[in-house]
Amino acid sequence: MERRNTGWAKGFTKNTHPSLAKMAQTFKTKKIDNFKKWREESKLSGKIPASYPEFKKDKNLAFLIGMTLGDGNIYKFPRTENLRIALASKYPKLVAFTANVIKKVFSKTPTVRKIKNSRCFTVGIYQNNISSRLGIPTGERSRLNFNIPSWISENKIFLTNFLRGLFEAEGSLSVHLPTCTYNFSFANRNKSLLKIVEKSLKLLGYHPEIRSVAVRLRRKVEVENFKQLISFRVYKLRG
């Protein structure tokens, strides 16, 4: 006979369980932190970091910033923050590549989840001060007014990886050989991101076309060159 999971809290959270909901609300109202002692002891023992250093400025961080701006969100909670990047399940190698980059940036393994009844994976990680260290505000991305950091814009390798993150997230490449039509497009409704992509492509010597919700490369030579430059849809796990 199959054993059934009879855990007393199965299917509940502290806010929905009939016995815990009232207690949780009381703690919240009185601002009681029942984990404070444990957290302080964990910091002293090194189990929880007392502080979080700035991220190393390298190609992994540049890629992650671009990817987060394109397909990610940073959520703020009372005692932590959560970076979550949503990726199409038809690109499993991109999911693995992104998880590997996050692991290198954070020195911590992220959680990869398949979203039920969807064609989507999420790659996520919890840690304090994610937003301030990435330089990306928490909350809705569509209204975000982002300025590209100088350490990225002034370094070709970092700029290339930043653009790779953006194009892997929101880019599309189409080639119609009978008419010799080439289109490498970055589509987004955020005006500041479109301006950043336009400026970055020009810094690298390209001639982008600007549309209301997209920035495009249309010249055959530039499309082929840029695809190779950013290794678009080519994923080799970084050592």
Where are these regions (language model features)?
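Internal intein/HINT superfamily modules and their associated LAGLIDADG
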Residues: 1-239
